[in-house]
Amino acid sequence: MADAPNQKWAGDISYVWTREGWIYLAVILDLHSRRVIGWAVSNRMKRDLAIRALKMAIAFRQPPNGCIHHTDRGSQYCSHDYQKLLRQHGFKISMSGKGNCYDNAAVETFFKTIKAELIWRYPWETRRKAEMAIFEYINGFYNPRRKHSALGWKSPVAFERKVA
């Protein structure tokens, strides 16, 4: 993991079924606290989805040069525009070994958690309803209130406050 905020970030994309079709969720986590610091939803899994999540994280955290940014080797993360944005902000780029999902375990765990606690519990009528529920889950529950055993049973926000 990381000893302090803004040392290591990780990102990935997952999907959610609605009666209108799929939506895709891109997230960026700070690996120190497991806090979701950037996220975006779209009905297409294109590079702009990943870029929007990264831009949100950058605007929110303003990371120092040398912050490690880890993802898998998906086309969105390998794209010229995404890589350029990382370089412009001084990130040290890290990518998973080919076909190794365990390299990004923290983000995969987040997706497992949001799916078990929210996504799989309801039949999502519309993409918009799913997106709003994801917003509420991340900002109203996961970051400020969801306790993690790895964080000494603190939420990501409380864990970061303790460090500050």
PLM-predicted stretches and their roles:
Residues 1-164:
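Charged DNA-binding/catalytic regions of mobile-element recombinases
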